[in-house]
C-alpha cells in the first residue's frame, strides 16, 4: 500500500514509490497461479506471469495517469492517461530481455494480455489488437506518437521508478534506458511500416499454434484474478478454502435405513456403486482420463459423486466444483449439503453460485461485506475459492468461453480442481461440439480431474475429443440394468401420437384429451406428474386437468393458492410442514380427493422449493408432523416444465412426458416409482398439440426446427424408439436406460446428423475471441427479463420501495425470476442491469402460474 492508502497509484501523494505494493502483489499471485505450468510452446508460465504482473500497470507512471487517478484535471487529450498499450510495449521488451529463451509465441501472448487487461467483455482478441496497432493509418500513427509522448513523460518524471520495475521484471537484464532505445528504434520511421507496426500486424495472422486459446485464457484470467484480488485488499491467507469434512458424509450414509425386500437390494447396490466409484478415483487422479459415473436414476448418484469428488479433492489437495444444469436442482442439493456437512453457503467450505443466488463468503471483521456487489466477500465466493462450490453448467462453461472480467476470476480456481458435472446430457445440443474442447482445456491445461455423472451418458468425450479417453468408475454397469430387468420399476408406454415419429408424422393430442388421461391416471389415490416442453403448454395442460376460473367451485386444492392465501393472512411464507397441514385442512373442508401443483420457471424459486419440499421431503418436522403430500391419502397431480426433469427427488405412480429426445424421456421416467414401491410405474410418451393462442407444437419449439421439420434429436429419437417398442407399444426400463440411450447418441455422432455448433468449437481452436464473445449456453435466459416478484411483507417492503439496492436484491434471491413478463409494477436500474419489479399479490402474478 502507498502512504495515501491507494494500492494502485504506484506513486503516493508524498512521492514515495509503491515498490512492494500493487505490482508486486499481482506478480506474486500470478506466479503462484501459473507455477508448475508451461505454455503450449514449453515456456514456463510462471516466468511470463511474473513479468506480466510487474509491468501491466507501468504506464500509470505518466503525469496524466497520476492526475486522473487522483481526480485531478489535466489539459491533454484524455487518451494520454490510457496505460494498457504502452504498458504492453514494456511487457514485450521485458520478455525479450530475460536471460533465457522465451519464444515469440510467449511474448505475443504476454503482450496481448497486458494490452487488453482492462477488457470487461472478453479476453483481448489478437485480430482486434492487430487492427488497432498494426495498420498503416493516420489513427494508428497518432497512437504511436501519443505513446512516445507518454514514455517521454515517464522519462522526465519517473524514470527511476520505471527502471526499478523493469529491472525486477527482467532479473536485472533490462532497464528503462534500454527500453527507451529499443522503443525508439522500433518506431522509426514513425510515418511508415516500422517494427512495432509490423509486429502487431503479424499478430492478426490467423495461422496460430494449437492451444493458443488455452494460453491466452490462462494468462488473462490469472491477471484478472491477481489484479482484482489485490485491488480489493484480499489478503493472501483469504485466497483459499477448506473442504467439508468427508467423515460427515460417511456418517450420514451409514445412518440411512437399510430397507426391506427389493429396497434392501437397491440400497446394497447404491452403496456398492459408491464404494466402487471411490475406489476408482484413486486411479483416475493419476491419469488424464475423464471419469464416468453411469447409474440409473434412484441409484445414489449424488452421494457417489460427492464422495468421489471430495476424495479426489483431498488427494489432490485442491477444491471441488460440483456442477448441475438447473437452479432448482442446485437449491435442493445445496440444502442437502448444508444438512450433511453442517456448513453455510457463505463460508470458506461451501459456496452456492448461480445467477439468482446471494453469493459471498463471510470473511469476518477484516473486510466490509455490507454492500454485496464485488466486495472482497463476493469476489472470494464468485471466484470459487471455497473448498466446495456448487454451480451450474452455464456458469462453468461460459466462464471458459471468452470469459468476461467477472467470470475470469474463477478460472484460476479450476487449476488441479475436481469438477463433477452432474446430468451432462442436459447441456444444450448446440454446445455439444464446444464442450469437449472446454473439457480438454480443463484436463490438459489446468490438470483438473473431470467426472461426468448421469443415467444417460451423452458420449461427449467418446465422440467429441481426440485427446481424451474415459474411465468408468463403476466396475460393472450391466448389473444395474440387470436389476431393473428383474425388478421392473417402470414401463415406457409410447402413445399413438408418437408412433409415427420415425416417418415424420406430427399427429398430436389435444389438451382436453390429455387432461382426461391425467385425471383418469390420478384416480384411486394415484400420484401423477406431467412434464411439458414449454411454460405455455404446461399452463394449458394444468387448466385442462383442473379448471382455474375463480368463480368455479371445484372440490380440489391448489398448492399455489394455498401459499398465497397464507401469505395474505400472515405476511410470511409457510414452512413445508405448514403447507402440508394447510393443504390437508383445505382438502378436508372441501371434501377433495386431489391436490394440484404447478411448477415452471415463471414461479418464484422460493415457492418452487417450498412446493417440492412439501411434496416429498420426509426429513422435515418431527414425529407429529404430517407425511409428505406424495405419501398421503390424497392424489397429487403435478404439472411442470423440465424444472423437475433431473435431480429433483420426487416419485410418482404415473408420469406423462411430452415428446422429447430420449435422454429427456429417461430423466422424466426417473421421477416414476423411484423406490420400486407397489405396482410397476407407467411413463407415457405423447405429443401435445399447440397451446391456445399459439400455432407451434411444443416439442418442435424446444427440440425442432423451422418449417415443422424435426431436428436431428427428434428424428433420431423416433428411429430408436421404433426399433425397440413391442407389440403393445411399450419399452422396458432396462432397455430404455441403456440400449436406446447408446443407440441415440451413436446415431447422432456416428451418422450424418452432426449435432452441435461447429463454429463455436472452431472459434476455440482458432482463438477467435470475437466469435466467442457473448456466447450463451441458454439464449432464452439472456432474452428474458430479470423480474423481482415480492410476495411476503418483508419482500414487498424491500423490493417495492423506490430505494431498491444491490444489498436488498441479494437478500431476496428466491424472489427473482427470469421470464418474458407481460406486466410489471415498475422498472428499476441497479448498476448496469434493468429489473422489472412485480407485486406478487397483484394481478401481474398468478398464484399458480407465477409471473404473467
Residue ranges and their predicted role:
Residues 284-309:
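Walker A/P-loop
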Residues 1-77:
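Acidic/His-rich, divalent-metal-binding segments that scaffold phosphate/diphosphate chemistry
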Residues 103-258:
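N-terminal accessory nucleic-acid engagement/regulatory domains that precede
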Residues 407-485:
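Post-DEXD/H (motif II) to motif III coupling segment of the RecA-like Helicase ATP-binding lobe
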Residues 456-523:
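Interdomain hinge/linker at the junction between the two RecA-like core domains of SF2 helicases
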Residues 343-404:
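Inter-Walker segment of RecA-like/P-loop motor cores
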Residues 443, 512-523, 536, 540-543, ...:
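C-terminal helicase lobe and adjacent C-terminal extensions/tails of nucleic-acid helicase motors
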Amino acid at each position: 500500500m502507498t502512504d495515501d492508502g491507494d494500492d494502485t497509484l504506484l506513486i503516493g501523494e508524498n512521492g514515495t514509490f509503491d515498490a512492494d505494493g500493487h505490482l508486486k502483489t499481482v506478480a506474486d499471485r500470478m506466479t503462484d497461479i501459473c507455477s508448475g505450468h508451461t505454455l503450449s510452446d514449453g515456456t514456463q508460465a510462471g516466468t511470463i506471469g511474473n513479468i506480466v504482473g510487474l509491468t501491466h500497470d507501468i504506464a500509470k507512471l505518466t503525469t496524466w495517469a497520476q492526475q486522473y487517478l487522483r481526480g485531478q484535471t489535466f489539459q491533454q487529450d484524455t487518451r494520454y492517461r490510457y496505460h494498457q498499450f504502452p504498458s504492453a510495449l514494456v511487457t514485450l521488451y521485458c520478455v525479450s530481455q530475460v536471460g533465457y529463451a522465451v519464444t515469440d509465441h510467449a511474448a505475443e501472448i504476454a503482450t496481448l494480455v497486458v494490452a487488453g487487461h482492462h477488457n470487461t467483455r472478453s479476453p483481448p482478441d489478437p485480430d482486434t489488437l492487430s487492427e488497432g496497432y498494426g495498420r498503416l493509418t493516420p489513427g494508428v500513427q497518432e497512437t504511436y506518437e501519443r505513446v512516445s509522448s507518454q514514455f517521454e513523460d515517464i522519462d522526465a518524471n519517473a524514470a527511476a521508478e520505471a527502471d526499478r520495475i523493469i529491472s525486477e521484471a527482467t532479473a536485472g537484464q533490462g532497464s528503462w534506458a534500454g527500453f527507451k532505445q529499443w522503443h525508439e528504434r522500433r518506431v522509426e520511421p514513425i510515418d511508415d511500416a516500422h517494427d512495432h507496426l509490423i509486429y502487431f500486424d503479424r499478430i492478426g495472422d490467423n495461422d496460430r499454434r494449437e492451444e493458443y486459446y488455452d494460453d491466452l485464457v490462462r494468462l488473462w484470467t490469472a491477471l484478472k484474478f491477481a489484479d482484482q484480488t489485490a485491488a480489493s485488499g484480499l489478503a493472501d491467507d483469504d485466497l483459499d478454502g477448506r473442504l467439508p469434512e468427508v467423515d460427515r458424509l460417511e456418517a450420514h450414509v451409514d445412518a440411512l435405513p437399510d430397507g426391506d425386500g427389493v429396497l434392501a437390494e437397491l440400497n446394497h447396490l447404491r452403496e456398492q456403486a459408491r464404494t466402487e466409484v471411490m475406489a476408482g478415483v484413486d486411479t483416475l487422479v493419476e491419469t488424464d482420463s475423464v471419469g464416468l459415473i453411469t447409474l440409473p436414476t434412484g441409484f445414489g448418484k449424488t452421494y457417489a459423486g460427492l464422495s468421489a469428488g471430495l476424495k479426489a479433492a483431498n488427494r489432490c489437495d485442491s477444491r471441488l466444483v460440483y456442477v448441475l444444469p438447473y437452479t432448482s436442482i442446485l437449491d435442493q442439493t445445496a440444502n442437502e449439503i448444508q444438512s450433511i456437512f453442517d456448513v453455510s453457503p457463505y463460508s470458506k467450505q461451501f459456496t452456492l453460485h448461480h445467477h439468482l443466488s446471494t453469493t459471498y463468503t463471510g470473511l469476518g471483521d477484516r473486510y466490509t461485506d455490507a454492500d454485496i456487489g464485488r466486495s472482497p466477500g463476493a469476489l472470494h465466493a464468485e471466484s470459487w475459492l471455497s473448498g466446495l462450490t456448487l454451480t451450474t453448467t452455464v456458469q462453468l462453461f461460459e466462464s471458459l468461453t471468452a470469459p468476461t472480467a467477472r467470470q475470469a476470476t474463477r478460472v484460476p480456481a479450476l487449476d488441479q480442481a475436481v469438477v463433477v458435472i452432474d446430468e451432462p446430457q442436459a447441456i444444450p445440443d448446440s454446445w455439444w461440439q464446444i464442450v469437449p474442447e472446454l473439457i480438454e482445456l480443463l484436463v490438459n491445461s489446468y490438470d483438473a480431474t473431470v467426472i461426468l455423472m448421469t443415467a444417460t451418458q451423452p458420449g461427449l468425450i467418446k465422440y467429441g475429443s481426440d485427446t481424451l479417453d474415459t474411465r468408468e468408475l463403476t466396475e460393472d454397469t450391466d448389473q444395474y440394468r440387470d436389476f431393473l430387468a428383474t425388478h421392473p420399476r417402470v414401463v415406457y408406454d409410447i402413445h399413438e401420437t408418437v408412433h409415427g415419429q420415425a416417418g415424420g408424422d406430427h399427429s398430436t393430442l389435444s389438451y382436453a384429451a390429455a387432461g382426461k388421461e391425467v385425471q383418469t391416471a390420478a384416480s384411486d389415490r394415484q400420484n401423477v406428474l406431467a412434464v411439458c416442453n414449454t411454460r405455455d403448454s404446461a399452463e394449458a395442460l394444468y387448466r385442462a386437468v383442473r379448471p382455474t376460473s375463480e368463480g368455479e367451485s371445484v372440490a380440489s386444492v391448489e398448492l399455489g393458492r394455498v401459499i398465497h392465501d397464507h401469505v395474505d393472512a400472515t405476511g410470511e411464507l409457510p414452512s413445508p410442514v405448514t403447507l402440508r397441514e394447510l393443504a390437508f385442512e383445505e382438502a378436508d373442508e372441501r371434501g377433495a380427493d386431489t391436490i394440484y401443483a404447478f411448477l415452471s420457471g415463471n414461479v418464484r424459486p422460493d415457492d418452487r422449493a417450498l412446493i417440492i419440499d412439501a411434496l416429498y421431503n420426509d426429513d422435515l418436522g418431527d414425529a407429529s408432523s404430517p407425511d409428505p403430500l406424495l405419501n398421503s391419502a390424497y392424489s397429487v397431480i403435478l404439472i411442470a416444465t423440465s424444472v423437475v426433469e433431473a435431480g429433483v427427488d420426487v416419485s410418482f405412480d404415473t408420469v406423462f412426458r411430452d415428446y422429447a429426445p430420449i435422454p429427456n424421456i429417461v430423466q422424466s421416467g426417473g421421477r416414476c416409482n423411484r423406490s420400486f414401491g407397489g405396482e410397476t410405474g407407467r411413463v407415457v410418451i405423447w405429443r401435445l398439440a399447440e397451446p391456445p393462442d399459439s400455432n407451434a407444437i411444443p416439442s418442435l419449439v424446444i427440440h425442432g426446427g423451422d418449417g415443422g421439420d424435426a431436428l436431428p434429436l427428434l428424428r433420431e429419437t423416433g428411429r430408436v424408439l421404433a426399433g425397440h417398442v413391442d407389440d403393445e407399444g411399450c419399452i422396458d426400463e432396462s432397455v430404455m436406460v441403456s440400449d436406446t440411450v447408446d443407440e441415440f447418441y451413436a446415431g447422432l455422432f456416428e451418422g450424418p446428423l452432426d449435432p452441435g455448433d461447429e463454429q463455436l468449437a472452431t472459434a476455440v481452436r482458432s482463438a477467435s475471441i470475437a466469435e466467442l464473445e457473448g456466447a450463451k449456453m441458454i439464449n432464452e435466459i439472456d432474452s428474458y427479463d430479470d423480474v423481482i416478484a415480492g410476495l411476503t411483507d418483508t419482500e414487498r417492503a424491500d423490493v417495492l420501495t423506490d430505494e431498491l439496492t444491490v444489498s436488498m436484491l441479494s437478500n431476496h434471491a428466491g424472489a427473482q425470476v427470469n421470464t418474458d413478463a407481460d406486466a410489471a409494477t415498475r422498472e428499476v436500474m441497479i448498476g448496469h442491469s434493468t429489473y422489472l419489479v412485480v407485486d406478487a399479490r397483484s394481478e401481474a402474478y398468478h398464484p399458480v402460474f407465477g409471473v404473467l
